[in-house]
Amino acid sequence: MKLSESVMAQNSVSFQKLQEQCEEQELEAPGGIASPQVYNQLLALYLLHNDLNNARYLWKRIPSAIKSSHSELGGIWEVGQKIWQRDFPGIYTSISAYQWSENIQQIMEAVRDATQQRAFGLVSQAYTSISADDFAAFVGLPVEEAVKGVLEQGWQADSATGMVMPKKPDSAPLSLIPNEQQLARLTDYVAFLEN
């Protein structure tokens, strides 16, 4: 189920605020150890924003007693490891295999949706054609639903061959810098290095 663009934008803002609050709570926690709920949310939010470095450092900071006593935290980290390994089918399997608590459920659904969007984008950039089965595994959807999704995106699907032909993304126009501006930048850079 795809979220509309406006709902996703609203959720993005609220998730960003929640991440800032969790980071603040972690910093202000007595003894430097936050609650497991803060760690759960913060780790999931880092994964949502594809901030894998902060997710890894957070995982290293979390005391091992909290890691071992809260299995949900391990489940979130398992999803993070799959993201790190770019194991897209594994990401979806890990997300759906766990019964998330109420305060994490919405974030993990957003992680799944963001991963699907990222997969759509990667396929559109990297492939001229891909089998519908491989594509469905890559985006974590049943084959019929994946083919329906590509047709909505303006892609082509051939039912006879079972292939999906992605539509190449519109490339952003390159802004050409006039030669004078480029020369001025180089001059400033060289002058900075000499001084």
UniProtKB/Swiss-Prot annotation:
Principal subcellular localization: cytoplasm
CC annotations in GO: COP9 signalosome; cytoplasm
Cellular compartment(s): Cytoplasm; Nucleus
Domain (PCI): residue spans on this chain: 10-183
GO BP field: COP9 signalosome assembly; protein deneddylation
UniProt keyword annotations, A-Z: Cytoplasm, Nucleus, Signalosome
Family indicated by similarity: Belongs to the CSN8 family.
Subunit description: Component of the CSN complex, probably composed of cops1, cops2, cops3, cops4, cops5, cops6, cops7, cops8 and cops9.
Role of this protein: Component of the COP9 signalosome complex (CSN), a complex involved in various cellular and developmental processes. The CSN complex is an essential regulator of the ubiquitin (Ubl) conjugation pathway by mediating the deneddylation of the cullin subunits of E3 ligase complexes, leading to modify the Ubl ligase activity.
Protein name: COP9 signalosome complex subunit 8
Source species of the chain: Xenopus laevis (African clawed frog)
Native organism taxonomy: Eukaryota, Metazoa, Chordata, Craniata, Vertebrata
